[in-house]
């Protein structure tokens, strides 16, 4: 982990804890927390192989429709069933997810302080009476899951904003780290679709705001305001993860070409500007705003202007992580064959 990555992790942890001891301007807190989560997630996504889950163009086109169906389903569940019952089921579901997400987030930092064999030697646990069901884990993962268990218990029992944010930030970092758009074309399709999705469900229906207020699970970050009438400002995790995976793609594009953060800087700046404009407009009109309305043009616009300015539209549009992975595999196979011949 490089110095700037370690500094970003420490800054994110400090900013999350700061409202416990000092009053932090919630608008500034929203922007800094979201940007730091994106920054950390992007750098964690840079690996020898692309992230494990790659989105296709077809998936990107269907995503707003699937998201709309899920959003409407939740709205109807809260409307016709007991709110406490729905949230109890969701809490149980996110309890498991939260432990896994926080474990995966903390593991790289914790591994450095544990014996090597704890990181390498896997333990296989088979379920009683169902031996086909097995789980493989290391002792390091067990250690890393302890804080996750603590925060999930705390959240389930108290619904404290800090426990909510720790789990929410973990979901954001893991989402950005593990998900790949594959190409900028797929990213543009996804962001454009969710641009209209966000506008429709926020401006033209009460569904989005109603679900956000009723959904008692770590799917949004909460920022204390000190105002009894409106105790928290909030930001949905989707407003961090969705643009974040596009920004991460820009960083990996830079790395693949051996250049230093050129397009990443543009995409990250676009995200920061878009989120800042969201906060300004929200405070001006004193009403909820679809954040992607401002973030999507910021991210795509800054990257588009940058590549047009440099005359690099073609390499940007032709970049495909799946093809790059296949080419690397072919090169490795060729090298290994040549080495065998030489031997």
Curated annotation (Swiss-Prot):
EC number, as in UniProt: 3.4.23.-
A GO CC term attached to the entry: cytoplasmic side of endoplasmic reticulum membrane
Chief localization: endoplasmic reticulum
GO molecular function list: aspartic endopeptidase activity, intramembrane cleaving
Expression by tissue: Ubiquitous.
Motif interval(s): Endoplasmic reticulum targeting signal: 340-343
PANTHER family per record: MINOR HISTOCOMPATIBILITY ANTIGEN H13 (PTHR12174:SF23), SIGNAL PEPTIDE PEPTIDASE (PTHR12174)
Family to which the UniProt record says this protein belongs: Belongs to the peptidase A22B family.
Protein name per Swiss-Prot or TrEMBL: Signal peptide peptidase 1
């Amino acid at each position: 982990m490089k110095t700037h990555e370690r500094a970003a992790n420490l800054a994110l942890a400090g900013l999350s804890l700061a409202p416990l001891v000092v009053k932090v301007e919630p608008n500034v807190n929203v922007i800094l927390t979201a940007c730091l989560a994106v920054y950390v997630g992007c750098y964690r996504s840079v690996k020898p192989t692309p992230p494990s889950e790659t989105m296709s163009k077809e998936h990107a086109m269907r995503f707003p429709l699937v998201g709309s169906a899920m959003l409407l389903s939740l709205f109807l569940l809260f409307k016709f069933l007991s709110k406490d019952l729905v949230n109890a089921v969701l809490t149980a579901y996110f309890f498991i997810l939260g432990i896994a997400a926080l474990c995966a987030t903390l593991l790289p930092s914790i591994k450095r302080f544990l014996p090597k064999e704890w990181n390498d030697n896997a333990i296989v646990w088979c379920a009683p009476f169902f031996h086909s069901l097995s789980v493989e884990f290391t002792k390091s993962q067990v250690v890393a899951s302890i804080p996750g268990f603590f925060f999930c218990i705390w959240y389930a029992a108290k619904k404290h904003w800090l426990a909510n944010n720790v789990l929410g930030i973990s979901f954001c970092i893991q989402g950005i780290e593990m998900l790949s758009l594959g190409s900028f074309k797929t990213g543009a399709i996804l962001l454009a679709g969710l641009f209209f999705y966000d506008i429709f469900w926020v401006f033209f229906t009460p569904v989005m705001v109603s679900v956000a207020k009723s959904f008692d699970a770590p799917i949004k970050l909460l920022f204390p305001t000190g105002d009894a009438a409106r105790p928290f400002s909030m930001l949905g995790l989707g407003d961090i993860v969705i643009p974040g995976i596009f920004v991460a793609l820009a960083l990996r594009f830079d790395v693949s070409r051996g250049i230093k953060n050129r397009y990443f800087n543009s995409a990250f700046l676009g995200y920061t500007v878009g989120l800042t404009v969201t906060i300004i407009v929200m405070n001006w009109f004193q009403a909820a705003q679809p954040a992607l309305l401002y973030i999507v043009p910021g991210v795509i616009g800054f990257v588009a202007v940058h590549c047009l300015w440099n005359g690099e539209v073609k390499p940007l549009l032709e970049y495909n992580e799946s093809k790059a992975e296949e080419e690397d595999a072919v090169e490795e196979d060729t090298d290994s064959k040549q080495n065998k011949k030489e031997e």
